[in-house]
Regions:
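Glycine-rich, aromatic-lined ligand/substrate-binding cores of catalytic
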Residues: 352-452
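Short glycine/serine/threonine/alanine-rich loop segments
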Residues: 272, 296, 323
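Conserved anion/nucleotide-ligand pocket segment
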Residues: 299-371
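Metallocofactor- and cofactor-centric catalytic cores in central/energy metabolism, strongly enriched
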Residues: 10-278, 282-293, 307-314, 413-506
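Glycine-rich beta-alpha junction loops
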Residues: 64, 140, 305-306, 330-337, ...
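Asparagine-rich low-complexity intrinsically disordered tracts
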Residues: 1-12
């Protein structure tokens, strides 16, 4: 009965125009140059368009890679309600590791204080996995069945059941400039666009691919996801205006424009949302102005999956307990193509930057603990072909205690790299689609959208995009999660939970 009442409550919140409208008053503190803290109150209306029956298109750059092919296979298998059998029995596709699929949050309390929780996707009217249509590009020509077979992620029984569907998915030719990925990747390249020495034609080709995909599948909205190999860092942040960036693409004499920016520009010009799930600095500041011009979003960077996600928990735990981390050393080795690409220094540097930055906000928030110091923070990644996708991660947290005592946490983490990443890709798709339907009415009646970087999605990224205004981003795991949970609550008129719960403490 309580479940039925809750569902009925949510249905009542949509108006005649299928807009969920909720007024919200929020307070925050600001400190001025005289170190005086002032409380500021703002009142807004949050407007959420109801989820329609339209399908959502997802176009993956690097669809034949481990993440792209496995996500596609998982979605197809889920849509077909397939199961598979191995020595442990019969299994169904469940997307364990997905916040969208399994994340719940407290929405109310019983009289005895026991929490009543709901799945996040049931609080807001979110898209279903059945609503997704997948396509994309790759610089390798193999159909997705052959790619999945080569990648060795799926159980063979499940792969056989998906064979016909996966064989029908052929990657579109991809944008390839050999200077931006590791030299050990070039021998496999056999499916590229043929616009020699003209990068603007590559942009136009990407636009054409997106529009054709929309037309062929009767789609209105597309999310474009970079899931390709890590590129070396680019120097395109020097362009303060997007007009200068576009001009350089049209006349790239110095070869400074990487493939990922070509896709980002093409996505923006079709009003598609662009997501960068790799470490490189694709989303340069001028692209935010460009995305705003086209009323779309540009989101990233680098999926936060295993070792780094755990670091965002443990480093916060130590500092929040008054324990001072002196050094954090992270070593890992893996044998998939991601590891192979990261063997070269330019590509590794992109990854190192995103992994190291994950503790910055924790240091900033604990000045008394760290003073002017920072923990020694080292990252090591090695390619070991024999272990394949079964990544080994070893972390040591060396910390200082009372009376100069020392504490060491040593963690050995063995995980399937792709099977951690794919459910997070699903999360990004689903929450990005939801947030694209939300606008805000300010006190002056102006209607605005989220900032172009969609920073509430920082929960899913190692190096969350700060946007044009260089928004301060929290990396600490539970701060990010509470922000996501509480925002979804206020959209549907449910009070946020600050865990003070004075009604039970007084």
């Amino acid at each position: 009965m309580l479940e039925e009442k809750f569902i009925f409550y949510l249905k009542l919140k949509y108006n005649y125009y299928n807009i969920m409208e909720n007024s919200y008053s929020y307070k925050y503190s600001e400190i001025n140059s005289d170190f005086i803290i002032n409380t500021v109150e703002r009142k807004i209306k949050i407007l959420t368009a109801k989820c329609t029956c339209d399908k959502i298109g997802v176009m993956i750059i690097g669809i034949a890679g481990n993440n792209g092919s496995t996500l596609t296979a998982g979605i197809l298998g889920y849509q077909k309600k397939l199961n598979w059998e191995d020595k442990n029995g019969i299994h169904e596709i469940d997307f364990l590791g997905s916040l969208y699929q399994y994340g719940s949050t407290n929405v109310a309390f019983y009289k005895d204080g026991k929490p009543y929780s709901k799945l996040l996707r049931n609080i807001m009217n979110m898209k279903k996995i059945d609503d997704l249509i997948i396509g994309g590009w790759d610089i390798i020509s193999s159909n997705l069945y052959q790619s999945c077979k080569n990648n060795k992620i799926l159980d063979i029984d499940l792969l056989k059941k998906l064979k016909k569907d996966l064989e029908n998915i052929q990657p579109l030719p991809g944008v390839f400039y050999k200077d931006f990925i590791a030299s050990n990747q070039t021998s496999k390249v056999n499916n590229t666009k043929i616009n020699k020495n003209n990068k603007w034609n590559d942009v136009l080709s990407v636009i054409n691919d997106i529009e054709n995909f929309k037309k062929r599948n009767n789609l209105k909205n597309i999310i474009v996801i970079w899931s390709g190999s890590t590129e070396k860092m680019n120097c395109c942040d020097k362009f303060e205006k997007y007009e200068d960036l576009i001009s350089t693409i049209k006349n790239d004499i110095d070869n400074i424009i990487p493939p990922s920016i070509i896709y980002a520009v093409g996505a923006i010009m079709t009003k598609s949302i662009f997501v960068n799930t790799s470490p490189q600095n694709t989303i340069v500041s001028s692209l935010h102005d460009f995305a705003k011009e086209y009323d779309t979003f540009i989101v990233g960077n680098d999926l936060k999956t295993g070792q780094t996600k755990l670091k965002s928990v443990l480093s916060d735990y130590l500092a929040s307990s008054g324990i001072k981390p002196l050094s954090i050393v992270s070593y890992n080795h893996l044998g998939n193509n991601d590891g192979l690409n990261l063997k070269e220094s330019n590509q590794f540097r992109s990854k190192e930057i995103t992994k190291i930055g994950v503790i910055d906000d924790i240091i900033d928030e604990n000045k008394e603990l760290f003073k002017d110091e920072k923990p020694d923070h080292e990252i090591v990644i090695k390619y070991v072909q024999a272990v394949g996708d079964s990544k080994r991660a070893i972390d040591e947290y060396y910390s200082e205690l009372f009376l100069k005592g020392k504490n060491i946490l040593s963690i050995y983490n063995l995980c399937e790299d792709t099977l951690l990443a794919v459910p997070i890709l699903l999360d990004i798709i689903m929450f990005t689609e939801l947030f694209s339907r939300i606008t805000f009415e300010l006190e002056n009646k102006e209607i605005v959208s989220f900032s172009t970087n969609l920073s509430l999605l920082s929960f899913f990224f190692k190096s969350p995009e700060t946007g044009k205004n260089k928004e301060y981003i929290y990396n600490a795991f539970f701060k990010q999660r509470y922000a996501l949970d509480n925002f979804i609550k206020i959209c549907s008129g449910i009070p946020v939970n600050d865990f003070i719960n004075l009604q039970y403490r007084i």
